[in-house]
Amino acid sequence: QMDQQVQNDLVEKITHRYPEDRIFAEENGLRSPISEGSVWVIDPIDGTNNFVTQKEDFAVMVAYFEDGIGQFGLIYDVMRDHLFYGGGEFPVYRNEVELTPFVDQPLENLLIASNVGMLEKNDWGMADLGMDSLGIRVYGSAGISFSKILSGGILAYFSYIWPWDYAAA
């Protein structure tokens, strides 16, 4: 399975360079506590269904934590060749371009992203919130959704997700 191979490659490179660091990752139950020591959080292919069916709108996500505090993250939109990186004390970039912070605007001028399940059930008022916004987008990948937030294309992403889905954001 491609997810497992990508994760194995990332884990091998990280542990070779940082042998004392630990891993928290989606595949194979690698679950070192994020709150203890130096921990890398990995989602090898976020948006696996998109990867398999469309060959687009998927991302590789890696984050680094020290004693439970995120130091930086990387989100790689593979098919667009966009690498988002930074966070914590570092500015945020897309490839070589520093991204500008969000500028507050009325909700009716902004797009939001969600997963289909939250919209269908109106969980937490998602469908209602969508009616008050410019519109809702469903990308099928937390990494792609977060990259849209970082680029200023959407305001927020709402979903039921795991730590490896949001750690890099």
Predicted segments with their positions:
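Residue-level signal for inorganic ion chemistry
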Residues: 3, 14, 48, 77, ...
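N-terminal subdomain of lithium-sensitive/metallo-dependent phosphomonoesterases centered on the IMPase/IPPase/PAP
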Residues: 1-45
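A structural micro-motif at secondary-structure boundaries
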Residues: 94-98
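An extended, acidic
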Residues: 102-169
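Short, isolated positions in well-ordered beta-strands
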Residues: 71, 99-101
